[in-house]
Amino acid sequence: AVMGISALCLFASQGLSVSAATIKEENIAHNQALAIQSNEVANWPTGPVVSAESAILMDADTGAILYAKNIHQQEYPASTTKILTTLIASERCSMDEIVDFSYDAVHDIDPGSNHIAIDPGEQLTMEECLNAILIRSANEVSFAVAEHISGTTWQDFAPIMNERAKELGCVDSNFVNPNGLPNEDHYTSAYDLAMIGRAFFANEALCKMTMTHMLHILPSERQPDDIMEVNKMELIPGGKYAYPYLVGCKTGYTDVARSTL
């Protein structure tokens, strides 16, 4: 039996703006042919071939690396960025704090990206915000939480992210926003994301949020809508690829990053 909790981080490769089917087939074949460094260690169990460009399996209790494939290669994290954002929020804020939604927080998100349709001037509790980020991957909520913690703009939250990442042992990362929306200066690695994941998985409340099937925010005097959104994570119980040993998870996707886990 394997003791403790393992953190698994996978990054698919970057794609180009041509046929999606061709990209997928070519990338899978290319990535499956990449070296798996842990398989080159003498007397170490051979790990599986995966279609991700980089991947890591780490014991979350000890930090021991059980599987390694290009673990220090810098990659775009997409919405897996949000495990760092929510971790910092849980460390710095109480769950009943009131978060204000500015015009910038609501309107700085990319068209078509995940959101819960909050309007400028409305408010949520920090607990509602973290649920919205981890269940619905809400980008405007990530901006609002970043503004709340920095006390100014969401851009000023980036130094806080980078400082905390270094404290957690990250060596390959630079974060410039709280939600992982595309930016060439925003990157991490499988190793760094696993190191952040060690701290995230130690927080039972955050893990529980990622496993919740439905986001439900009731109307209040702070915001008038009855917000209901489904968790689209397919690894949680009831999902298409439900994994019985899962304790918490966050996925991400952008056209640049491709799929991240």
Task: Give residue ranges: language-model regions.
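Generic hydrophobic, helix-prone segments enriched in Leu/Val/Ile
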Residues: 9-12, 76, 228
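Sec-dependent N-terminal signal peptides of Gram-positive bacterial secreted proteins and lipoproteins
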Residues: 1-18
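Active-site-adjacent loops and short helices of periplasmic peptidoglycan-processing enzymes
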Residues: 19-191, 195-204
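Domain-terminus/edge residues, biased toward the C-terminal soluble/receptor-binding domains
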Residues: 170-171, 182-187, 191-261
